[in-house]
C-alpha cells in the first residue's frame, strides 16, 4: 500500500499534535521486546504475484521500487500483524523452510519483511503467516519441484529471525516527497542486523539536542518543527535490542525531497 505524498504531512502533524497535547511521549508498544528466539517456530505460508516473480511492488513498509531490485529482489515477504507490529517490524529478516519432505528442501530461504499480510487461514490475530513472492516460495522446494510446491498454495512452515546482511551497503535515508523545512519525513533503507527501528532522532546543524521523530507508517518517520536547518545527523535505535547508531551530518544542508543520502556506517550484521 502506498500513501500519497500529500497525506504524509497530515499524518505527521496529527501525531505531533496528539503527542504534544498529551504532555508526554507515549511508549512504543513493541520497543522493549527482545529479538524472537532463534529457534524454529511454526507458521503458515502462501505466495502471490507471478510464479517466478518478486512479489509485491512497493508494499505497506513504503520501500517502493527498492523491492524490485537486489538485494530485496525476490526476497520480499508480507508478514502477518504479529510480526508487522504496526510497521515497526518492517525490515526484519527471517529464514523460512517448509516441512513436507517429499517436496521441501532442508535449505531455508531468507526473506525481508516489506509488506503486511492478513493473519493467514486461521484468521486469528496472533497467528504467524508469511505471504511470499512466487520465487521465494518456490526456492523452498527440492530441485525440480518449484512448480509442485507452488501448486500446493498453502504450506505449513518453520521460521526464525535472522540477521539482515546487505553486503556492500550502508544505512541510507530517503527523504520522502513533500518534505519541507517545516516537515521532514525519512525512510530507512539497508539496515543490517535486526533490521527494525524502535525509535529515531534527528539533530540540526549547530545543535546538541536530539529531537524525537514520530513513526507514521511502515519504515517512515517524520518531524514537525521549523524552520529546520541542515545538515542533519540521525540517530537510530533498534526495536528488538535497543542498539543505537548515529550518522553525523548524513543529510546535507542542501538536501532535496526524493533524494537518498547514504551514511558511512551500519549495524553489525548479527542479532
UniProtKB/Swiss-Prot annotation:
Tell me which residues make up the Expansin-like CBD domain: 182-263
The UniProt entry's GO CC annotations, sorted and at most eight, read: extracellular region; membrane
Q: Which Pfam families match?
A: DPBB_1, Expansin_C
Question: What membrane topology is given?
Answer: Peripheral membrane protein
Entry-linked InterPro entries: Expan_Lol_pI, Expansin/allergen_DPBB_dom, Expansin_CBD, Expansin_CBD_sf, LolPI, RlpA-like_DPBB, RlpA-like_sf
Taken from the UniProt record, the cysteine pairs bridged by disulfide bonds within this chain are: 61-90, 93-164, 98-104
Q: Which domain of life is it from?
A: Eukaryota
Q: Which residues form a coiled coil?
A: none
Keyword Membrane belongs to the record = yes
Subcellular location per UniProt equals: Secreted, Cell wall; Membrane
Question: How far does the signal peptide extend, from start to end residue?
Answer: 1-24
Q: Describe the family membership recorded for this protein in Swiss-Prot or TrEMBL.
A: Belongs to the expansin family. Expansin B subfamily.
The protein in question is named: Expansin-B1
Organism lineage reads as: Eukaryota, Viridiplantae, Streptophyta, Embryophyta, Tracheophyta
